[in-house]
A protein has these predicted regions:
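Polybasic, low-complexity association/targeting segments
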Residues: 1-13
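Immediate flanking context of iron-sulfur cluster ligation sites
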Residues: 10-27, 31-33, 39-59, 70
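Short Fe-S-cluster ligation motifs
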Residues: 17-18, 23-24, 81-105
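Short, flexible helix/strand-to-coil boundary loops that buttress conserved ligand/catalytic motifs
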Residues: 34, 68, 90
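Surface-exposed beta-strand edges and their flanking turn/coil or helix-capping segments
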Residues: 38, 45, 79, 91-93
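Amphipathic, hydrophobic secondary-structure cores in small proteins
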Residues: 52-85
Length: 105
């Protein structure tokens, strides 16, 4: 079932992700250890690589990306992206939107 992310509230997106996201099987893979547990760099990078692979086949990838772009997470892997990558996608989208508006004007 394909759902248009723009038609869902944040709550609706959370529900879809919780019910259908591949990350629901192992949330720690995508979020990492809790704030009180240290994670060595090599382990974090390896975990993030595996999380990205899981995201590749996720049936709600587009919903996850939409959700992540809305909430701007500070940590974790969302739709195969780290927070800094999501921020770069947002900047690029704003730049493209501004350029498109200039062309119309």
């Amino acid at each position: 079932m394909s759902v248009d992310p723009s038609t869902l509230s944040l709550g609706g997106l959370v529900t879809e992700l919780a019910e259908r996201g591949e990350c629901r099987h192992d949330p720690d893979l995508h979020m990492g250890p809790d704030a009180f547990e240290d994670e060595p760099l090599a382990e974090r990078l390896a975990r993030q690589d595996v999380a990205r692979e899981v995201c590749e086949d996720c049936p709600v990838w587009a919903l996850c990306l939409d959700y992540a772009l809305r909430i701007r997470p500070a940590f974790g892997v969302w739709a195969g992206h780290l927070p800094r990558e999501l921020a770069a996608l947002q900047r690029e989208a704003r730049t493209l939107a501004a350029a498109a508006l200039e062309e119309v004007a």
